[in-house]
Amino acid sequence: CAACHTGRAKPIFDGLNMQGVGLNNPAMTWDVIARMKEVTDMKIFIKGIEVAADSALAVQYGADGIVVSNHGGRATETDKGTIECLPEIVSAVNGRIPIIIDSGFRRGTDVYKALAMGASAVGIGRPYCWGLGAFGQAGVERVLDLLNRELLITMVGSGTPTIDSIGPDYVHDVGHRVPRGRLGRELL
């Protein structure tokens, strides 16, 4: 109501000059990493990396890390999944900076696979939101507990007692793709 709301949207970047910021902004080049480092001591991670060439450029231009992401499938829903992009990116980065991966990770087994394939960390989004929406803080805590337990069960079953012991020898590509509609999703 007008008693407590002005009716004016106030985004988190209110007060910042956002002129020229956008996906097609010609000023948005790899040099922005150096400009950002001039004004902050925070680590600069580049999100949205999906190919080896971009990950190599992120390293070259001084990024402190990258996030392999297709923004939950909303940005590039017909491209490869991020887990499919990960091996070439891990190879290009070659341990020089951390690699976080997100988009589509729902279970502890998903987290295990990403770590085994070379991710430094895995971002989880929607499961937290589902927990929050259903049960508030307790729901978020339960989601965290479930993901942790699933990861630990997978680690025990694989004989990997620590996160650092998880490696590529513990996952493999079965060499084929399961066609859409063959996973039971059509029943949902």
Regions found by a protein language model. Give the residues of each.
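C-terminal extensions of enzymes
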Residues: 128, 136-188
